[in-house]
Amino acid sequence: MTDIHNHKILILDFGSQYTQLIARRVREVDVFCEIFPHDVAADFIKNYQAKGIILSGGPESVYDSDVKAPEIVFELGVPVLGICYGMQTMVMQHGGEVKGADQSEFGKAIINILNSTNNIFSNMEHEQLVWMSHSDKVTQTGEHFEIIASSTNAPVAAVAHKNKPFFGVQFHPETTHTENGKQIIENFVVNICGCDTLWNIENIIENDIKEIKQKVGTDKVILGLSGGVDSSVVAAILHQAIGDQLTCIFVDTGLLRLNEDDQVMQVFAEHMDINVIRINAKNRFLDALRGICDPEQKRKIIGKLFVDIFDEEAAKIENAKWLAQGTIYSDVIESAGNNQSKAHVIKSHHNVGGLPKEMKLKLLEPLRELFKDEVRKLGLGLGLPYNMLYRHPFPGPGLGVRILGEIKKEYVETLQKADAIFTEELYKHNLYHDVSQAFGVFLPVKSVGVVGDQRRYEYVIALRAVVSIDFMTATWANLPYDFLSLVSNRIVNEVKQVSRVVYDVTGKPPGTIEWE
């Protein structure tokens, strides 16, 4: 079996908003990498045995901060790439000088490559469009570095060490705005560091299956299956690895999208022949939510009841030793970021509410090394349907936070029908994948309408569609008026409990993506 971790890159994080992008770009050229805090222990860096090290950008100013790259980085003899702040601290630690720029530079810029021989700019045109985001700049490179690229506002746009494989760029090759950023990353990782391209879906599947078999042996494994991307891919990889040793528990809350409960059973229980226990808990959730209007209270009730029901059912499965979860790499990084110590051991991220103490199950997280886009590709490689893997994000509490105020069975059914029409038309008009998220919201207010000669006094549905890269900010989707008119007409005509449809034109900020 191929050792997919044999050739790897270590990324030291100085707090840049783009650090995860660096990792994703490295993995896009089929090389494994991991992110750790910049102040991780020197022994850890030494023992990690990276083929190369990348120093990320960061929000600090080098000249008034004691945040520096560990000296061990420059003593190991492996190639180093400093990005933005990473370049500045590397140059400064080698006798160069960094000062505050007269003018901050944010946005696209043209750099001129002065030297592309055997470095990060190999086989690239002399003019390159890049993305700048900095307030400081290198003013003196010192005796060890030479300038290999410059721009109008950043005379030192990139540097190379005269004797060692150390490189720095003032811009951000990891962003899509840098036209040939992927080529720069590939030049560093593959050509300079000499990494073999082992990190691909076929190798990951082979590696994961072997690791799961070795770890689990003949034990039984329990998985909470929600129908979401992560738990679905975990179910598929575990089934390939251990077959009938896996039992999935699907808690049907009644708050899923239209027919989603049946679709989950169809894909996993019927087509893939996975052992799935379906728990019809619709009435329990409705009873628990009766009279509750506060959004936060609703979330807590739904989350606690879900875990309680899962625990009840899991306790009935004899000889189960493992609890599988869909923890992914961004969860792991987030957990590490919340840990203020320098420890490089990353704490577990329990995305199903944590391990119940009395169950004493060991945790199995087959996806913890993968980003979301890698999880989706893994799912395709395992034979899961494209539309299941590339659906829009869906909140954990489900429609519970898309029905404003109290949740009633009538409201759920009304929203399911309206939301399904919106989604169906987005697919029909090839708009679904042009937006990042789209859904309906049930408003518990009534509005007068006229259908035929009949006066109707029924509920209002709000349609929400946004475009976003990271979901931290979002713009409302500028869907065609004809399309919105069609969707509105269908909902009012086909869903008898709705008399009016409105479209949400609020960005984030000031609004949030979900209404509750």
Curated annotation (Swiss-Prot):
Q: One GO MF term, please?
A: ATP binding
**Self-association state and partner proteins as the record states:** Homodimer.
Kindly give the InterPro entries that the UniProt entry links to this protein.
Class_I_gatase-like (IPR029062), GATASE (IPR017926), GMP_synth_C (IPR001674), GMP_synth_GATase (IPR004739), GMP_synthase (IPR022955), GMPS_ATP_PPase_dom (IPR025777), NAD/GMP_synthase (IPR022310), Rossmann-like_a/b/a_fold (IPR014729)
Q: Does the keyword ATP-binding apply?
A: yes
Glutamine amidotransferase type-1 domain spans which residues? 8-198
Function, as annotated: Catalyzes the synthesis of GMP from XMP.
State the GO CC annotations: cytosol
* Signal sequence annotation: none
Enumerate the spans annotated as GMPS ATP-PPase domain: 199-391
Know the name of this protein? GMP synthase [glutamine-hydrolyzing]
Instruction: Write down the chemical reaction(s) this protein catalyses.
Output: XMP + L-glutamine + ATP + H2O = GMP + L-glutamate + AMP + diphosphate + 2 H(+)
Q: Which residues are involved in binding ATP? A: S226, G227, G228, V229, D230, S231, S232
Question: What top-level branch of life does the organism fall under?
Answer: Bacteria
The record's SUPFAM superfamilies line, in alphabetical order, gives: Adenine nucleotide alpha hydrolases-like, Class I glutamine amidotransferase-like, GMP synthetase C-terminal dimerisation domain
Q: What class of enzyme is it?
A: ligase
**Source organism of this protein record:** Francisella tularensis subsp. mediasiatica (strain FSC147)
What UniProt keywords are attached to this protein's entry?
A: ATP-binding, Glutamine amidotransferase, GMP biosynthesis, Ligase, Nucleotide-binding, Purine biosynthesis
Is Nuclease among this UniProt entry's keywords? no
Q: What pathway or pathways are given for this protein in its record?
A: Purine metabolism; GMP biosynthesis; GMP from XMP (L-Gln route): step 1/1
Q: What Pfam families does the annotation carry?
A: GATase (PF00117), GMP_synt_C (PF00958), NAD_synthase (PF02540)
Could you say which EC number(s) this protein's record lists? 6.3.5.2
The record's active-site residues are C84 (nucleophile), H172, E174
